[in-house]
Amino acid sequence: MIRHYKISVPKSTLNNIYKKVRSYPWKMIQNVNGWEYGTNYNFLKKISQYWVSKYNWKKFENKINSFKNYKTNVDGINLHFIKEKSKNPKSRPLLLLHGWPGSVIEFLDIIPKLAHPEKYGGKIEDGFDVIVPSLPGFGFSTPTVSYTHLTLPTILRV
């Protein structure tokens, strides 16, 4: 069964995340300026500070919720996906899959252009029904216990 889904992360969850980021034991990380041993220390500190003090999660929620979000269960896995339907009566589905460590947010700016080209100087007949799933364990899809039974055809049943 496919059901509508609205992304709404409770303020208490966000506050808990911010608290964990603020209290991270930075002294445990070796202060190496380069990227040879992983993420650059200064970059990581800077982006962490940005995330807890300036990033607007609710603005992001509004952006992703401007699309039709859904959840469905496939073989016991709750999969989240975005579906943006074109006004093209002969539209074909276009499946966009993110990789690791990506997510559906990589496609948020291109979804409307693919589904509604007429709004960007194109023709309605060029529009696709765009489907963008959050792969299992990413975004708002639940992780699997084992990936052995999970195949692309299983995900494509969405």
Regions found by a protein language model. Give the residues of each.
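A generic "structured core" feature
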Residues: 84, 95, 131-132, 143-144
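Conserved small/polar residues in nucleotide/adenosyl-binding loops
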Residues: 148-154
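Glycine-rich "HGGG/HGxG" loop immediately N-terminal to the catalytic nucleophile
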Residues: 59, 135-147
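Short substrate-entry loop that stabilizes the transition state in hydrolases
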Residues: 101-107, 117
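Alpha/beta-hydrolase
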Residues: 97, 133-135, 152
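Short beta-strand element of the alpha/beta-hydrolase
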Residues: 91-99
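Non-catalytic accessory segments flanking enzyme active sites
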Residues: 13-86
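Conserved alpha/beta-hydrolase
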Residues: 118-140
